[in-house]
């Protein structure tokens, strides 16, 4: 297989976990434009960074001339995918799913081009066909093609079945058939020959390929991207303070940017290959120089810039960079009121104040100091700053200390900060 074909380039970036009939799929997509799809169940009001790889994969295919189909699981989200889940999901209401569908649709729409000719992206909702099918038709037309023996041995659900304290309901057990039917419908009506997803979706994707082959004798394909696990065993995108969301109202662009700045050094160049469109040859050159002073930090910044702009746009990237310079480089020149609102949202601890008189009191209130005595000693030792300016004696707050009349940044050393909100 040529090292220059599309599938080989995906391998070269470490983007493929599973793939079926690789040679045939590679020939197919080199010879014609295909349609492919990826599904997203609206089980929350926002997608998170665990969804980024499939979204970016769709974008890569579109850039290569193929038509991406995004399937919103308006129906399947009412059931919930049990794959590798330790316990049964809590059912979501129709009301919530409808609201979440609207929000997630807007998020996803920013990633792809919906007006570029034959390979314009398509956005669908599987509620369109599931609301039209009755249970008897589904069991006859779909269920008869699946062996329960095979289904219970799938790794995605086997751990639940073998746990007497949990088990799995018939409702969740049937999810596999619902997703298989999605692939069948998209293949029949939209000529989707490929489904992509996370590695945990391999069982569901395989079921879709099986159903299509049994009903139509057609050969279709599946491809999954890696599931990323951090060194502590936690799924990528989870932090001590919670999930990193794509919605700027749930995770500010600044916090999103900082997440990438704080990834483990060992992952920097791998993530540049996974999440950016920078050429692999250029990334390899950067990696060769990683031991040069500040090179890793610069390359983390490159990663953070690319992904923040992809998800949030240029303006919010610039805001994240301004806030970073404000906190860590003491640069207040271009800081804006909206930047400080981001810090208040989730960037650093904050407290609402009205009548705080002096710095020692404020340090105790913000827990930067445990007592006024400790606060006094920290001030004397030159470790306290107000709005990035060092303070060497106790300070009475004035209007000039309030940025935009609302905010005062207190810092202890380089890494501990708190925001006074007046």
From Swiss-Prot:
One of the record's GO cellular component terms: cytosol
Motif ('HIGH' region): 42-51
List of residues binding L-tyrosine: 37, 175, 179
GO biological process, any: tyrosyl-tRNA aminoacylation
EC assignment: 6.1.1.1
Its job: Catalyzes the attachment of tyrosine to tRNA(Tyr) in a two-step reaction: tyrosine is first activated by ATP to form Tyr-AMP and then transferred to the acceptor end of tRNA(Tyr).
Protein source organism: Buchnera aphidicola subsp. Acyrthosiphon pisum (strain APS)
Source organism, top-level taxon: Bacteria
Family: Belongs to the class-I aminoacyl-tRNA synthetase family. TyrS type 1 subfamily.
GO MF annotations in UniProt: ATP binding; RNA binding; tyrosine-tRNA ligase activity
Protein name per UniProt: Tyrosine--tRNA ligase
Uppermost EC category: ligase
Keyword hit for rRNA-binding: no
Chief localisation class: cytoplasm
Subcellular location, record wording: Cytoplasm
Annotated S4 RNA-binding domain residues: 357-414
Catalytic activity line of the entry: tRNA(Tyr) + L-tyrosine + ATP = L-tyrosyl-tRNA(Tyr) + AMP + diphosphate + H(+)
NCBIfam families the UniProt entry points to: tyrS
Keywords: Aminoacyl-tRNA synthetase, ATP-binding, Cytoplasm, Ligase, Nucleotide-binding, Protein biosynthesis, RNA-binding
Oligomer and partners: Homodimer.
């Amino acid at each position: 297989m040529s090292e220059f074909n599309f599938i080989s380039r995906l391998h070269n970036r470490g983007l493929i976990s599973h793939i079926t009939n690789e040679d045939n799929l590679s020939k197919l997509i080199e010879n014609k434009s295909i349609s492919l799809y990826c599904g997203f169940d609206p089980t929350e009001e926002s997608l998170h960074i665990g969804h980024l790889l499939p979204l970016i994969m769709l974008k890569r295919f579109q850039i290569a001339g193929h038509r991406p189909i995004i399937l919103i699981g308006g129906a399947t989200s009412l059931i919930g995918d049990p794959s590798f889940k330790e316990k049964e999901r809590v059912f979501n209401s129709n009301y919530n799913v409808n609201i979440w569908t609207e929000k997630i649709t807007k998020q996803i729409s920013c990633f792809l081009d919906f007006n570029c000719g034959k390979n314009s992206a398509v956005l669908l909702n599987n509620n369109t066909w599931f609301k039209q099918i009755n249970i008897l038709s589904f069991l006859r037309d779909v269920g008869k093609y699946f062996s329960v023996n095979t289904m219970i041995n799938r790794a995605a659900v086997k751990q639940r079945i073998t746990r007497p304290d949990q088990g799995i309901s018939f409702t969740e057990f049937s999810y596999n058939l619902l997703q298989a039917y999605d692939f069948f419908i998209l293949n029949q009506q939209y000529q989707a020959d490929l489904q992509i997803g996370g590695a945990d979706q391999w069982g569901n994707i395989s079921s879709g390929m099986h159903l299509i082959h049994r009903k139509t004798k057609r050969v279709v394909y599946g491809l999954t991207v890696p599931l990323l696990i951090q060194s502590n065993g936690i799924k990528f995108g989870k932090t001590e303070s919670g999930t990193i969301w794509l919605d700027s109202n749930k995770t500010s662009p600044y916090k999103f940017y900082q997440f990438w700045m704080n990834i483990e050094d060992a992952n920097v160049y791998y993530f540049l290959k996974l999440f950016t469109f920078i050429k692999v040859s250029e990334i390899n050159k950067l990696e060769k120089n990683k031991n040069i002073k500040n090179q890793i930090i610069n390359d983390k910044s490159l990663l953070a810039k690319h992904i923040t702009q992809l998800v949030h746009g240029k303006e919010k990237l610039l805001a994240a960079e301004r806030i970073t310079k404000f906190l860590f480089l003491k640069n207040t020149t271009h800081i804006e009121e909206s930047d400080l609102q981001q810090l208040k949202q989730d960037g650093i601890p904050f407290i609402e104040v009205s009548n705080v008189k002096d710095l020692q009191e404020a340090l105790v209130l913000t827990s930067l100091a445990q007592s006024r005595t400790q606060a006094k000693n920290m001030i004397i030792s030159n470790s306290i700053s107000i709005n990035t300016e060092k303070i060497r004696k106790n300070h009475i707050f004035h209007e000039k200390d309030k940025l935009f009349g609302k905010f005062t940044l207190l810092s202890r050393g380089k890494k501990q900060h708190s925001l006074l909100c007046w």
